[in-house]
Amino acid sequence: MRSHYNTDLGISHVGQSVKLCGWVNSYRDHGGVIFIDLRDRSGIIQLVCDPNDSKEAHEIASNARNEFVLIAEGTIRPRGEGLINPKLKTGEIEVVVSKLTIENESAVPPFAIADESVNEELRLKYRFLDLRNPKLYENFALRSKACIAARNSLANMGFLEVETPILTKATPEGARDYLVPSRVHQGEFYALPQSPQLFKQLLMCSGFDRYFQIAKCFRDEDLRADRQPEFTQIDIEMSFCEQKDVINVAETFLKDIFKACGKEIQTPFRQMQYKDAMENYGSDKPDLRFNLKFIDVIDIFAKSNNEIFANIAKDTKKNRIKAIRVPKGDTIFSKRQMQRFEEFVRKFGAQGLAFIQVKEDGLKGPLCKFFSEEDLNELSKRCELEVGDVVFFGAGAKKTVLDYMGRFRIFLANELKLIDPNALEFLWVVDFPMFEQNDDGSYSAMHHPFTMPKNIDETDLEEISSIAYDVVLNGVELGGGSIRIHKNDIQQKVFKLLNIDEEQQKEKFGFLLDALSFGAPPHGGIAIGLDRLIMLVTGANNIREVIAFPKTQRAQCLMTDAPSPASNEAMRELGIKLRENIK
């Protein structure tokens, strides 16, 4: 029906006849000549409807309004001097219309498509209108390129695309499952998969050797700006591999994806042990686009005559005292800013935020009186302090200090505008602990219970490490993976350490344990979050900008009004009756 998309046209097409299709983005009547900005998925081009060129087209144009669907035929001509619009890709040209058809009319739209100030809830309610914005279209065009590049890259490395079930069995993977009642087997439920984890391991047991899938996953968890109840991941698994093999494959297809999206990245990526990431940056996904690395000063504070700090410093296993040096910070930060910094860290469990300023005549601040001159000199040397610097200190329980100082590091970087928005800093975080302690004192698997432990016979669960790895980009976890347990006895031992008894093992994981009993190969894999990846590549403000029909932060679809009550008939067929006032 059309000859071109709007932005395929430029100054080189002057004099050419074209046929264009799209929507009225804006309409202007300038003394008899009507100008219409015609929008298609690629962008906007200006139509000129002059009665001297076509009286019929001009008359039809006079009836057009915003979001009417038009088909326009005409000739490309250059815009007049001083009329070029540098904001448009087609800003040097316009179309003199000879024939115009109104293909469909539109109700008055609730908002202008290009209006960026529109409330997001209104945009999501009318998502089909919101998606007419060419800026959003560009996100999905890039997403499509990324998926094609991933498929081609993995196929070239010998991976086979296999689809795994959506209706499956509930298994504990860290979040709540979405349950689907069975009509045929009343009182029983399917679960939507949180990941294809167990099925891809079974494919390795089946001898498929290399699998991938662009998989839809579901998790019923509290939402954040970068999370959705349903999301997509690039999921891979491979047999007869070590950690380095999986990392090499992941770097290869990530490089191909970024190339398809017009960005070059350097491989191999940096690697950092989990414990170093936590101790130096307060995060297992550190943003390395800026420095502000922690400095360990607990041994120096142990010598202070401040009772609080000295007591904290006595237990170096459970407690931490960390410093962050800000070069020239004393010359930058106002008193009010320093107060804001303390208010910020208090929100995350800090008792306060101590600091020392470096003046021309030495170190200054309330802390200084608790140290000898020798200790202050050692502190200055350790922190590499110079005149004009300020150094902040966090002290207390290990988990709390690392958390709030890690958050404070990011807060400082934003205050100081240290982050280059165009930089791409990749990092592998490796050697994760196998288990982590919950608030109630119990333990759970840090990644998942199918991860291969390095030292399974260690009696202290917190000392058992795993062959697990996360890939991080600009402080965002893109994905994670591990080498899997491929021996039945090791898998059962891990289950036992997690207090999953034999009966529960058989009920929930019997099929996996069976598969591991029939010659399962060594295997491992990784999953990359496609939505997060595209969010970072496009620079989108949140993950909803790269998902066609996303849910809100309350897990609702405002457009379709999902979730919604089921009919009484549907409930009867499923054998379900809702109880009131369940707590």
UniProtKB/Swiss-Prot annotation:
List site positions: Important for tRNA non-discrimination.
H30, G82
Subcellular location field: Cytoplasm
Alphabetically, the GO molecular function entries are: aspartate-tRNA ligase activity; aspartate-tRNA(Asn) ligase activity; ATP binding; nucleic acid binding
Q: Which InterPro entries match?
A: Aa-tRNA-synt_II, aa-tRNA-synth_II, aa-tRNA-synth_II/BPL/LPL, Asp-tRNA-ligase_1, Asp-tRNA-ligase_1_N, Asp/Asn-tRNA-synth_IIb, AspRS_core, GAD-like_sf
Q: Which GO terms describe its cellular component?
A: cytoplasm
Q: Which UniProt keywords apply?
A: Aminoacyl-tRNA synthetase, ATP-binding, Cytoplasm, Ligase, Nucleotide-binding, Protein biosynthesis
Record's superkingdom?
Answer: Bacteria
A Pfam family annotated for this chain is tRNA_anti-codon
**What EC number(s) are associated with this protein in UniProt?**
6.1.1.23
Q: Which NCBIfam families match?
A: aspS_bact, PRK00476.1
UniProt lists the family membership as follows: Belongs to the class-II aminoacyl-tRNA synthetase family. Type 1 subfamily.
Name of protein:
Aspartate--tRNA(Asp/Asn) ligase
Provenance organism: Campylobacter jejuni (strain RM1221)
